[in-house]
Curated annotation (Swiss-Prot):
Subcellular location per the Swiss-Prot or TrEMBL entry: Cytoplasm
Keyword Electron transport tagged: no
Predominant place of localization: cytoplasm
Listed Pfam families: Endonuclease_5 (PF04493)
Organism: Streptomyces coelicolor (strain ATCC BAA-471 / A3(2) / M145)
Reactions this protein catalyses: Endonucleolytic cleavage at apurinic or apyrimidinic sites to products with a 5'-phosphate
GO molecular function: deoxyribonuclease V activity; magnesium ion binding; RNA endonuclease activity, producing 5'-phosphomonoesters; single-stranded RNA binding
Family recorded in the similarity comment: Belongs to the endonuclease V family.
Site, Interaction with target DNA: residue positions: Y86
Keyword annotations: Cytoplasm, DNA damage, DNA repair, Endonuclease, Hydrolase, Magnesium, Metal-binding, Nuclease
Protein name according to UniProt: Endonuclease V
Amino acid sequence: MTTVSVQIPAGWPATEERARAVQDELRARVVLDEPGPPPGTGRVTGVDVAYDDERDVVAAAAVVLDAGTLAVVAEATAVGRISFPYVPGLLAFREIPTVLAALEALPCPPGLVVCDGYGLAHPRRFGLASHLGVLTGLPTIGVAKNPFTFTHDDPDTPRGSTSPLLAGAEEVGRAVRTRDGVKPVFVSVGHRVGLGNACAHTLALTPAYRLPETTRRADALCRAALRDAAYRA
């Protein structure tokens, strides 16, 4: 496995005003009219981050799985300084430099990227999954643990049931039941994937647990990378 060190990029937004301007600029480049790769084919990659705010350190992990078997194909981590303060709606600016570095360190193309967070299900319709997709050109989806500020009806009890995730009358994602009777996850399009396909990918990635295998493995790996960084320090 490769671990890389990350520097905050020159010109990276340092203020909320500048970050929102970047979101406005990049949001117009989100592609919503592609279905995306078929579920269960090719590769699928989970990305996640872990923070040590006291030491101003963030660790990111990218774990590539075979989409058909869910076996690990490759993995990489990156460790760097936190690149932006904690501001709801702007969390991508804290995460993207290290996530990009982890993706770039992979020895193979990642295929579909699954983010632990949001894409269009975001107050400005440009969450981490959309931001990462636009910057990389990769198909991306967001699978979140909570509905953020949006509303939804509870899906039916069986696995595979869904209900719209709504901002008023606008559907920004779906609540997807991945285990019978267990709290749903919240799926949204990031870039170059349709919402129905994003939900199908999510179900293909959750054969045994509520959260996708991509998220589970990336979460464990980024936490280990953060512990290792603390040990080395």
